[in-house]
A protein has these predicted regions:
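Long, low-complexity, Ser/Thr/Gly/Pro-rich intrinsically disordered segments that act as flexible linkers
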Residues: 1-475
Length: 475
């Protein structure tokens, strides 16, 4: 484990996902009612900060705690300012965080809808629990404390998310199966770490490895440096990402909260129409657009026979092993995209070894994703990601891989799945599915996914939470 990695310092759900143990969540965005009430608001927030959950695996907890809802807090730049964080410390935060998501939206190609405006907040309170009722009860308890103090904080929005049935985004695909393997956290880098082919055996030894089907052996991979995800640690370039000094910065991270409305019926209708036109089964066409199999999320690069269906009572260890195996692939095995199209969504968001410089270049722009589908009846996704640099992580992926295909040899073509409406009010990007007779998919009449709004937040460590809780009292 790298020196200085203190997993108990990191808020829950960052390095260790709540996952299936806590499949439901409630996200509450709040802001100060007025700056004149900043002191009262700070007192309420200080109480919440003392109840924040940190990096513990649910399976390692006593049974009572495994059933207890988990609270996490994150702050916008405006929220830290309102709570009285000194200006000198605020200026140590990177400019994209200080500017906020709304100011950066145009550069990312976002056009937030005018109806139901997405109002900026000061802090995000999130509760994860075993069911929606437990989330609701815990949120009400926390907000009652605010009401008892006279309501110095106003609720901007509440969003219920998650699915007690588990694991699928609204278009029907298994989600969240590929996450970075992080140094100091994970043990097995295969599939989710950095692929470094230069460390692979050469000559006859290499040929023997190929014959045995173990080309992507463990020695060919390494874990992603901790500093890509946590402040105060070395990243892939050997340096720590810019951030505030102690006690506020180290072991903290940045969070992007994004609400993505999904046009489930529109996507299904489009796929059905195009499938009839090109003579392809609708399910196969869906999978070509996404780049993974709908049933289990396994890659199209490898044959389905490599991923036998799991037993119903599979253990967590077995599920994790299967997930790792499903991510043990390289796009150099499918350079023309005959199996997984070059424009498939999964290639656009994580090109792996397909970029010049291979997997090591890609790992400079990885994020940890913790998305959850909206609770019914709404259809969409709460996209949550964590990285030590919003600009180098989320924004880079959005600008240079999703909105622009040049780095992947696709010209200016956007991600077909995520493209937003253009100046004319509709998407403009095509998608090519390679083959003996290539299939060209025309732009849909309206986006499959619409960005409802977004916020950039700072997720403080245990020590930083204690410091923030005592900030108002000290002043």
């Amino acid at each position: 484990m790298p020196p200085g990695v203190e997993l108990s310092e990191v808020q829950g759900n960052v390095l260790h996902a709540y996952g299936a143990d806590f499949p439901c969540a409630r996200f509450v965005r709040l802001r100060l009612a007025s700056q004149a009430r900043a002191g009262e608001a700070a007192t309420v927030v200080a109480g919440w900060l003392r109840e924040v959950s940190f990096g513990r695996r649910p399976k390692g907890l006593p049974e009572r705690d495994r059933l207890t809802p988990h609270l996490n807090l994150a702050f916008t730049a405006g929220g830290l300012t309102a709570l009285g964080v000194p200006t000198t410390l605020l200026h140590e935060f990177p400019p994209e965080f200080r500017a906020g998501a709304k100011a950066r939206a145009a550069a990312l190609g976002d056009r937030w809808p005018d109806e139901r405006p997405f109002t900026e907040s000061h802090l995000l309170l999130s509760v994860h629990a075993t069911g929606h009722a437990a989330c609701e009860r815990r949120v009400r308890e926390l907000l009652e404390g605010n009401a008892a103090a006279g309501g110095p904080l106003e609720v901007v929005q509440e969003r219920a998310a998650g699915d007690e049935g588990g694991g699928r985004e609204p278009f029907g695909f298994a989600d969240g199966g590929s996450q970075p393997a992080v140094e100091g956290v994970d043990l097995d880098p295969v599939g989710d770490g950095v692929y470094a082919a230069r460390t692979a055996p050469a000559g006859r030894l290499r040929q023997r490895a190929e014959d045995l089907g173990i080309v992507q052996a463990k020695r060919d991979w390494r874990l992603v440096r901790t500093g890509e995800f946590l402040l105060g640690h070395a990243g892939e370039d050997g340096a720590a990402a810019p951030g505030p000094s102690a006690p506020l910065g180290p072991n903290g991270t940045f969070m992007v909260y994004r609400e993505l409305d999904q046009d489930v019926h529109g996507f299904a209708d489009y796929v059905a129409e195009q499938a009839r036109r090109v003579g392809m089964p609708a399910r196969e066409l869906q999978e070509k657009i996404v780049g993974r199999r709908r049933e289990d999320g396994s890659t199209l690069v490898r044959p389905a026979e490599d991923f036998p269906q799991p037993a119903p009572a599979q253990s967590a260890r077995e599920r994790n092993g299967r997930r790792r195996r499903s991510n043990d692939f390289l796009y150099t095995a499918d350079p023309q995209g005959y199996r997984c199209p070059l424009g498939a969504h999964v290639r656009r968001t994580n090109p792996r070894d397909a970029l010049p410089g291979g997997g090591e270049r890609t790992m400079r722009h990885r994020i940890i994703r913790r998305g959850m589908r909206y609770a019914p009846p709404d259809e969409g996704l709460v996209f949550v990601c964590y990285a030590a640099s919003i600009e180098n992580g989320f924004e880079f992926i959005q600008r240079y891989w999703i909105n622009d295909g040049a780095a992947l040899g696709l010209g200016a073509a956007p991600d077909f799945m995520l493209q937003q409406a253009g100046e004319a009010g509709r998407p403009t990007g095509h998608m090519v599915i390679p083959g003996y007779r290539p299939v060209v998919l025309p732009p849909p009449d309206r986006p499959f996914v619409t960005v409802r709004g977004c916020e950039y937040l700072f997720v403080p460590s245990r020590r930083a939470c204690a410091w923030l809780a005592g900030l108002h009292a000290a002043s």
